[in-house]
Amino acid sequence: MTITQAEKQALIDQANTARQRAYVPYSKYRVGAALRTKSGKTFTGVNVENAAYPDTMCAERVAIFKAVSEGEQEFDTIAVVTDNGGSPCGGCRQVLSEFGLDTVVLIANGAGQLLQELTVKELLPEAFTPEKLGK
């Protein structure tokens, strides 16, 4: 599925809107994600912090888990928006790789400006994928 510039911007805008709902009482670092499936559905996510820091959940994974819980497992594009255009953490990169190395990742800042566009494979070279399990 090809994504147009207008569709990219729409995903960035959805992620930016979602970002305002992030629960970040500790870091104040709001992250929003908008994930488009190959069937054309979109799922958003925000980061949710916890006083027990390791139990914090990233926006990207929230969007992925929402999609999977609704029966979607094939992804086309994910937009990630932070104030300064931060990229997905290692854990999110690994979870994204589970569902396809060709997923496009759009990284944008809080002004809605696209800063980077790359694939999961480019974000996580030599990813540990299900194929590595020999199944």
Predicted features along the sequence, with ranges:
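Compact, glycine-rich, soluble single-domain proteins
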Residues: 47-62
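C-terminal binding/interaction regions
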Residues: 2-21, 70-135
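Short hydrophobic alpha-helix segments
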Residues: 45-46, 118
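Short, well-ordered amphipathic alpha-helical segments that serve as non-catalytic structural scaffolds
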Residues: 14-17, 59-66
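Short beta-strand scaffold segments in enzyme catalytic cores
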Residues: 28-37
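Short Gly/Pro-enriched turn/cap motifs at secondary-structure boundaries
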Residues: 23-26
